Amino acid sequence: MPHAKNALDGARIYFEDTGGSGIPVVLHGGLLDSVDDVRESAGARALPPGEFRAVYVDHRGLGRSDKPHDPAAYAMPLRARDPIAVLDELGIDRAHFVGMSWGGRLGFGVGAHAPDRVRALVCGGQQPYSWLDSPLTRVVTGGLDDCQHDALALVEAFERFWQVRFPKAQRARWIDNDPQALRAMWTRALAEGPAATNLTEWTVPCLIVMGAGDADFLDQAQRAAAELPRGELLLLDEADHYAAHVSADDALIEAVLRTLRAA
């Protein structure tokens, strides 16, 4: 299986590369996602074959990447080097980065810590500032507290919160996550503070995609889009955080392609 090694701490990061001569796009999913989920995401489906080279990456702590149980291993300066290690492994200088939720926050981190490797960012369902107490953050904390040998309690907490039943195959993948790694990831994220600062000085194009009903992150996402010199905010009507995560809205696909092609 293809892995890249993070030079800062030796963490092994799993990736899948579609290859070809197109412009590379690194894609990350959400808090429970593996590359198997990311391949099915709206961001992935938006990429015309041949025009772009999709590189799917498992977050540290998820999928086939290493899963340390120490919260310190999930510091943003370390996490931001994970996809850069993948680019180095593939001999790629610069790429677009597309991420949703947990992946959107990582996108802000990459923009902060490795802007010279970024063509454009698409950050969905997230914001770069410190985490605020909100209904969703309380759901994640409570769900993780209840997890034992797998992530079933967190998956069920999400289903109750969004009043959905996740697709069978995706649900099984999510449940199979390592709860100790998830708790370490979450503990560090809540304690760490901003994923990125000095947004007014950024030169990287950044599309922020939010559900108009995402009460947890919308205000801060609007603030970030206003601060970024090349920032743009796309609101998906009648979508909460989860609905935006799985959206295949034409406006989303058009905005993603416009952002990537213009960079």
Regions found by a protein language model. Name each.
Residues 7-66:
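Conserved HGGG/HGGXW glycine-rich cap/lid loop of the alpha/beta-hydrolase fold
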Residues 239-250:
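Catalytic histidine-centered segment of alpha/beta-hydrolase-like enzymes
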Residues 182-198:
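Active-site nucleophile elbow and catalytic-triad environment of alpha/beta-hydrolase enzymes
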Residues 202, 208-210:
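Short beta-strand/loop motif that positions the catalytic acidic residue
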Residues 95, 99-104:
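Conserved alpha/beta-hydrolase "nucleophile elbow" surrounding the catalytic nucleophile
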Residues 105-113, 119-150:
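Flexible "cap/lid" loop of the alpha/beta hydrolase fold
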Residues 215-221:
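Conserved alpha/beta-hydrolase "acid-adjacent" motif
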Residues 40, 46, 56-96:
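Active-site loop/oxyanion-hole signature of alpha/beta-hydrolase fold enzymes
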